[in-house]
Amino acid sequence: MTPIRIVLLLACALPSLAACRETPQAKAADLHKVAATRKTELARRIAAADAHPGSMTELAKWIMPPELKEISGLALTSRGTVFTHDDNVGRVSEIDPKTGILLKSWAMLGNQKGDFEAITIAGSDVYLLRSNGKIFRFKEAADGQQVPFSVYDTGLGKECEFESLAYEADSSRLVMACKRFLNKQDPHELRIFRLPLPLGNRMAMTSIRVPIDEVIGTNKWKNFHPSDLNIDPFNKNYIIVASREKGFVEVTPDGEVVRSQPLPGDHRQPEGIAITRDSILLVSDEANVMPPVLTLYRWRP
């Protein structure tokens, strides 16, 4: 895998076969040109959206590479890129959301398999969550490398199925929402668990419960099944997306529902959500008839 690859176009989908024989340096130069062009166009679209505020205007849609066919959670880095992953392999990919370019990928030792559903970053640690509540902790690495990891079992796997994980920096804790209750009696609520860092003390875990009627609001949903959760960088509220309902809710850390609405645009299977520090909403869709994509919108608080 080359350190930088474009994810919208195939490398050899070029006017001539000679282009496929370019040197790595020439290909890198071409990618830099594409990146510059896309950033310029994105800036133009942002300016146009800001000239007509009021709606979450679509800014760009990037097709993801085959290894992200089942793209899942999203986690923003301090440098403005985003970490994401496929939900069947313990491999992390870094993408520039402003250009749709895949920068690198690395994995946990042994190419771990499993139902990995969410990702977050806390300091220098990366966390991957399995649907059974087990959390894998490891470090960022260079392209193609494998890194050691540790595993923490939250003990919540018998109670819930999970697909969301976020780092709440103000409280130094991990936040995860129950997607589906596994007991026979569904409590009809949105339940959000919070685990203080460092992990290890189950007794320190807390949760908030939000009645499902408040979550649904005026929407025609019958329930709400969280597929990812992230923190709004501006007001620190929880932004929770649900693939089945194709909508999202904004909830305060105290459990108050601020808003509940359908996602903008056309989303076949939205699995990840994040908000950048410059007010761009990112939504990832895994392949479902159409290829996997990362869509950008102007975020409207």
Residue ranges and their predicted role:
Residues M1-V7:
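Bacterial N-terminal signal peptides that target proteins for export
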Residues L17-A19:
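C-terminal motif of bacterial Sec signal peptides marking the signal peptidase cleavage site
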Residues R21-P301:
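Sequence/structural signature of beta-propeller domains
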